[in-house]
């Protein structure tokens, strides 16, 4: 089943149906999470799977990246719910617990897979964070999710 879903996501991307591709891609952590953590609830397994297989490679814990927002499991789960249940391509920061990922501005952008996600932080005079922004490349995100799901499906599903 994963192979067919990935094939259809890729067809959507090739035909520039970016929101359709994203909506389907955001279901992959549900499917893979169910296979990997069958006894966990939906929210827990989605976030857990995403944190383990996607977010672990997005999070920058270097001194220059420690404040930067990133694609956490919470962010992707929030985006999944917004798109699939509300038709809204935005996230609700108040529902995200990780302070680092509570963004003031969230944008979905369309570009090639070579164009990654960007995050920025603005500091006030007292070096306190006053603004966080996260731009997520739809094609890049779909590619990360599909390739990860395909790779893991060979092992688990």
Where are these regions (language model features)?
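Charged alpha-helical initiation segments
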Residues: 1-19
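Short, hydrophobic/aromatic alpha-helical segments in well-folded domains
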Residues: 5-8, 24-27, 79
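Anionic, Ser/Thr-rich low-complexity intrinsically disordered regions
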Residues: 17, 37-41, 90-108
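Short runs of predominantly hydrophobic/aromatic residues within well-ordered alpha helices
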Residues: 18-25, 73-76, 138
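Short, contiguous, well-structured surface segments enriched in hydrophobic/aromatic residues
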Residues: 19-60
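Histidine-centered, metal-coordinating catalytic motifs and their short helical/loop contexts
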Residues: 69-98
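A contiguous, mid-protein "functional segment" used to position or interact
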Residues: 108-153
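Conserved small/polar residues in nucleotide/adenosyl-binding loops
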Residues: 155-157
């Amino acid at each position: 089943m994963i192979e067919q879903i990935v094939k259809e996501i890729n067809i959507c991307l090739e035909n520039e149906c970016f929101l359709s591709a994203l909506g389907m891609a955001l279901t992959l952590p549900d499917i893979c999470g169910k296979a990997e953590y069958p006894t966990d609830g939906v929210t827990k397994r989605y976030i857990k799977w995403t944190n383990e297989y996607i977010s672990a490679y997005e999070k920058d814990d270097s001194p220059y990246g420690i404040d930067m927002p990133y694609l956490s499991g919470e962010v992707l789960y929030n985006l999944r719910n917004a798109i699939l249940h509300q038709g809204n391509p935005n996230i609700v920061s108040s529902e995200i617990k990780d302070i680092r990922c509570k963004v003031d501005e969230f944008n979905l952008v369309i570009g090639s897979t070579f164009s990654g996600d960007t995050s920025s932080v603005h500091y006030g005079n007292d070096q306190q964070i006053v603004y966080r922004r996260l731009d997520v490349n739809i094609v890049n995100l779909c590619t990360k999710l599909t390739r990860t799901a395909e790779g893991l499906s060979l092992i688990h599903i």
